[in-house]
């Protein structure tokens, strides 16, 4: 991650920087802050999208598939989540409190959640995988319906509750003018690469980011 020249490498303090993180990148940064390896100075703005603060059931699913515990799985979902054997990155996203998440992982999640809530500036989550009209939209719809999510409110990969973990849910709004924006975008849409929807205010991630600047 590139930071400003005023940041302090000796203390790991990030100053005068705008951070945008998508998905697991925010969990990694939260864990680094919780472990004392990084500090977010008040002069820095941290913008986060689709953060799996409790993990993702996609990790549990791919581990079950690779362990032979799932039958009738869809090959395109496996391509989306990653192939067997499961790598360490995939395993590290096991959903908090489940059989694939160790006591140490559960504790690390809790610490990361506290660091996230205390330092993040603006957050984009999604309570629907309907998303924008793109070639991959059907794949994320399939993931949203097929994966064993705890809630139907998910972006295909990350549940709304996981993304908003540690933050008051009444602080979220479906207006792109809200710093805490609850959308109807799928997981890839929240990375901004597919632009904005035409009609719904709940599908305008780029406009949301512009309003933050």
Where are these regions (language model features)?
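Low-complexity, repetitive regions of proteins mediating host interaction that are extracellular
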Residues: 12, 36-37
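Structural motif
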Residues: 18-20, 47
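Gly/Ala-rich beta-loop-alpha elbow adjacent to hydrolase catalytic centers
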Residues: 20-25, 29
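Active-site signature of alpha/beta-hydrolase-fold catalytic machinery across serine-
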Residues: 31-35
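Helical cap/lid subdomain of alpha/beta-hydrolase-fold lipid enzymes
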Residues: 37-213
């Amino acid at each position: 991650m590139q930071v400003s020249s005023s940041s302090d490498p000796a203390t790991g303090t990030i100053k005068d920087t705008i951070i945008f993180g998508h998905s697991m990148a925010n969990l990694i940064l939260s864990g680094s802050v919780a472990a004392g390896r990084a500090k977010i100075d008040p002069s820095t703005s941290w913008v986060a999208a689709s953060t799996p603060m409790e993990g993702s059931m996609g990790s549990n699913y791919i581990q079950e598939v690779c362990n032979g515990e799932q039958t009738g799985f869809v090959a395109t979902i496996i391509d989306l989540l990653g192939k067997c054997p499961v790598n360490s990155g995939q395993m590290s996203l096991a959903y908090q409190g489940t059989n694939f998440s160790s006591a140490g992982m559960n504790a690390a999640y809790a610490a990361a959640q506290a660091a996230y809530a205390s330092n993040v500036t603006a957050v984009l989550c999604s309570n629907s995988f309907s998303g924008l009209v793109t070639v991959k939209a059907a794949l994320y719809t399939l993931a949203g319906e097929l994966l064993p999510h705890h809630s139907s409110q998910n972006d295909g990969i990350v549940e709304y509750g996981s993304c908003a973990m540690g933050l008051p849910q009444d602080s979220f709004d479906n207006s792109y003018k809200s710093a805490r924006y609850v959308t109807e975008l799928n997981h890839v849409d929240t990375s901004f690469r597919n632009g904005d929807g035409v009609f719904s205010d709940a599908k305008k991630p780029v406009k949301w980011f512009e309003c933050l600047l």
